[in-house]
Swiss-Prot record:
Consequence of substituting residue 65 to F: In UTEX 646 / Bohlin
Subunit structure: May interact with CcsA.
Pfam families per the UniProt record, alphabetical: ResB
Primary localisation category: plastid
Name used for this protein in its record: Cytochrome c biogenesis protein Ccs1
Length: 420
């Protein structure tokens, strides 16, 4: 019974079926939004009008289709597929490799008739044939008048490496799903922060209690005044608040600390900071009123009832903003350290900005990379041709034949050069 189960799991057709099933589940996870709120699923997949006739929000939540890649049944499929590859490797591929390493001598001349390439040579030097085969980089094994030769045995390792690479990729995927996390933080300049706003995490994830500080944030612009790049000067702090690592990050250039990646993803303007003639600091919050554009505004009142004042609009981090009155009339621009005369003079001392960070870790990524490395290596090795040649000397005749697993035409040319 156990052997039958092992044979079923090691069967190539069963492995292909599991692979197709995993691919189908991955497609489902791509089509259905992952890790969203229940309200989104209720809106997009209503009970009264099922998508594709079957998808409703309650079924999505019931079967875990809102987090496909972290469900027990998806892990079970990956585990079965990995087990199938392991059994196939040990029960089929390794025994096949061991057989290929053995000296498979032909004992009778009738065996040559099963080969696609074979011939009989009359009055041909046996030593001359062996010399040519040696010159073609074959390994030669001889027992009196019979000879077995092969080359390219390493090419038979390619299927084993394919299995190994797929197992590593699967293991890396599971490790990343169980122990990884992704968080998003919006942090004002000069502020400290901890990882708190978790977007996704695995069942066994331990969120690091790392403290960090945004020392500075700035933006570079092109000649056409569009954003070229934005940067954050970020420091990692220890428990005592002392800096242990510091780096300026930008888009596609993250800070990496203990396997945790800090990516620059977004930016925002938080407020304007003014100083009065009495050195009193006043802050006005900025509101982004457009989802598609980076435009912020604030209301600077000139009376206690907040009924009079000016509107300040800003769309950049170049150090200036525009002033409008209650009727929308443009009054002018104000730059940093410049005074605006309202009921009392105010000096713009700072445009308070914040940086958007995506913080994530995936402990399985190195395992996945190693899996792809072995996959590429197996692809290169698979191009190495595994060829075999058999010879039997009988009286004054030489029976010689060969076979190969690929590049048949090249092998035929090589074979005819040997017997020429």
């Amino acid at each position: 019974m156990k052997q039958q189960i092992f044979r079923l799991l090691a069967d190539l057709r069963f492995s292909i079926f599991l692979l197709l099933l995993i691919s189908f589940c991955s497609i489902v996870g791509t089509v259905i939004e992952q890790d969203q709120s229940i309200e989104i699923y209720k809106t997009n997949y209503p009970l009264t009008n099922p998508v594709f006739g079957v998808l409703t929000w309650d079924r999505i939540l019931l079967f875990g289709l809102d987090h496909v890649y972290r469900t027990w049944w998806f892990f079970a499929l990956i585990f079965l597929f990995g087990l199938s590859l392991i059994l196939c490797t040990f029960l089929q591929q390794l025994p096949s490799l061991k057989i290929a390493r053995r000296c498979q001598f032909f004992r009778t001349t009738n065996q040559f008739y099963r080969l696609k390439i074979s011939t009989v040579l009359n009055d041909f030097s046996f030593n001359k044939i062996l010399g040519r085969i040696t010159g073609s980089q074959y390994s030669i094994f001889q027992q009196k008048n019979i000879v077995y030769c092969y080359k390219g045995l390493i090419g038979r390792i390619a299927p084993i490496l394919v299995h190994l690479s797929m197992i590593l990729i699967l293991v890396g995927t599971i490790v990343g799903s169980l122990f990884g996390f992704k968080a998003q933080e919006i942090v004002p300049k000069t502020e400290n922060f901890h990882i708190q706003n978790i977007l996704a995490n695995g069942q066994l994830t331990v969120i690091p209690k790392t403290s960090a500080r945004i020392n500075d944030f700035w933006i570079t612009y092109t000649k056409t005044k569009t954003v070229s790049q934005f940067y954050s000067d970020i420091s990692i702090l220890n428990k005592q608040g002392n800096e242990i690592e510091r780096k300026t990050i930008s888009v596609n250039h993250p800070l990496i600390h203990n396997g945790v990646y800090y990516y620059q993803t977004d930016w925002n303007l938080v407020g304007l900071r003014f100083k009065t003639m009495a050195n009193e600091i006043i802050e006005y919050p900025l509101i982004n009123f457009s989802e598609n554009q980076k435009i912020w505004l604030t209301w600077i009142s000139t009376n206690k009832s907040l009924t009079e004042g000016v509107v300040t609009i800003i769309d950049n981090l170049e150090g200036y903003c525009s002033i409008y009155n209650e009727t929308g009339q443009f009054l002018g621009n104000i730059e940093l350290n410049e005074i605006i005369n309202l009921k009392q003079p105010l000096t713009l001392i700072e445009i308070i900005s914040s940086t958007g960070l995506q913080i994530k870790t995936d402990p399985g990524i190195q395992i996945i990379y190693s899996g792809f490395f072995f996959l590429m290596l197996s692809t290169l090795i698979s191009y190495i041709t595994y060829s075999q040649i058999w010879i039997i000397q009988k009286e004054k005749k030489l029976f010689i034949g060969g076979t190969t697993n690929r590049a048949v035409f090249d092998f035929e040319l090589e074979f005819f050069k040997i017997i020429k």
